[in-house]
From Swiss-Prot:
Annotated metabolic or biological route of this protein: tRNA modification; tRNA-queuosine biosynthesis
GO CC terms: cytoplasm
Lineage, uppermost ranks: Bacteria, Pseudomonadati, Pseudomonadota, Alphaproteobacteria, Hyphomicrobiales
Keywords, comma-separated and alphabetical: Cytoplasm, Queuosine biosynthesis, S-adenosyl-L-methionine, Transferase
UniProt-recorded name of the protein: S-adenosylmethionine:tRNA ribosyltransferase-isomerase
Catalytic reaction list: 7-aminomethyl-7-carbaguanosine(34) in tRNA + S-adenosyl-L-methionine = epoxyqueuosine(34) in tRNA + adenine + L-methionine + 2 H(+)
Length: 363
């Protein structure tokens, strides 16, 4: 499909730079294909679901993966930024470097030495490989838990570009840009639909007889990369590491067997559950990388509803929601949301989407 089919105009003032407080007071647009849109709030969510349904959350935890460093070469020092996006070994991370043209294989980069001292000593890395789109493989001198502590000491929360271009990261972001149930460290970006949940809302949902299950997908910096291709068939997704346990897979299959619905909180949960589901509609344990790219025409195997924020024009995430609820429906929903003052992107409001075809299909 042509990428320009997923374009729309978004006034800059609709981009949220801070979340609402409390978290669950964000607006929630209920989208049911073929029916009028309904304005709600996130705290209404348990009224929109049914006992026996199951919510699926991504429990990944954002790490301070934005590093500032100096590339040192004989007689030449240059400033370099690195956004870590996938751990591939105890001492190895794939990262996006900026500006990448200043770096070549074999270069040494010293992180955390400009205004911030690394209390564990130097946080240095070697550029082992260079790839496309500014991607590189960094091999650090530190390893394992010691490396994790050093990154936490000198790193910054990698705010999305549309926020970072407007203001710097601060201490409030370390709390705001993290779900209340985050526990598995490794994400570069937050699973933002989950940012709306409070402990009190989670308790109310559970009390209504709605199950809560957790999966892990470490969201990578590739989620911020623009789609540069003119056709969706020419776009390549960056892989992300995920895990679905046997217990969670069995529980979700039981939900469908008794007629309940699976509601994914966020596109990351949806992409992982769909990756773990076979053509027979059975969710299976999963551990590994997924680069699933969902566009209109995809036949969903497991997920019945999706709670998600409002996404960028021409983005893979707007393509995903268009596959889920229909391209025309989503254009209409976004036009409605823009006119009605909904806040967009990571710190913005949310939508609850029902699938355009409520029968589960094989892919």
């Amino acid at each position: 499909m042509r990428v320009d089919l997923f374009d729309f105009d978004l006034p800059e003032e609709r981009i949220a730079l801070r979340p609402v407080e409390p978290r669950d007071h964000a607006k929630l647009l209920h989208v049911r294909p073929g029916e009028p849109f309904e304005d709600r709030h996130v705290y209404d969510l348990f009224d929109l679901l049914q006992p026996g349904d199951a919510l699926v959350f991504n429990d990944t935890k954002v790490i301070p993966a934005q590093l500032e460093g100096m590339r040192e070469r004989t007689g030449n020092i240059s400033q370099v930024s690195a956004t870590l996006h996938m751990r591939v070994g105890p001492d190895r991370w794939k990262a996006f470097l900026r500006p990448a043209k200043r770096v070549k294989e074999g270069d040494r980069i010293r992180f955390g030495h400009s205004g911030t001292s690394c209390f564990l000593g130097t946080l240095d890395a070697t550029v082992a490989e260079k790839g496309d789109s500014g991607e590189a493989l960094l091999v650090f001198d530190l390893s394992g838990a010691v490396l994790d502590e050093a990154i936490a000491a000198v790193g910054h929360i990698p705010l999305p570009p549309y926020i970072a271009s407007k203001r710097p990261e601060d201490e409030r972001d370390r709390k705001d840009y993290q779900t209340v149930y985050a526990r598995e460290e490794g994400a570069v970006a937050a699973p933002t639909a989950g940012l709306h949940f409070t402990p009190d809302l989670l308790e109310k949902i559970k009390a209504r007889g709605i199950e809560e299950h957790f999966v892990t997908l470490h969201v990578g910096a590739g989620t911020f990369l623009p789609v540069k291709a003119d056709d969706t068939g020419d776009h390549k997704m960056h892989a992300e590491i995920g895990h679905v346990s046997q217990r969670t897979a069995s529980a979700l299959n039981a939900v469908h067997e008794r007629g309940g619905r699976i509601i994914c909180v966020g596109t990351t949960s949806l992409r992982l559950i769909e990756s773990a589901t076979g053509e027979d509609g059975v969710v299976r344990p999963w551990s590994g990388a997924t680069d699933i790219f969902i566009t209109p025409g995809y036949r969903f195997r497991a997920v019945d509803l999706l709670m998600t924020n409002f996404h960028l024009p021409r983005s893979t995430l707007f393509m995903l929601v268009s596959a889920f609820s229909g391209l025309d429906t989503m254009h209409a929903a976004y036009n409605y949301a823009i006119a009605d003052g909904y806040r967009f992107y990571s710190y913005g409001d949310a939508s609850l989407l029902e699938r355009i075809d409520h029968d589960r299909h094989s892919a």
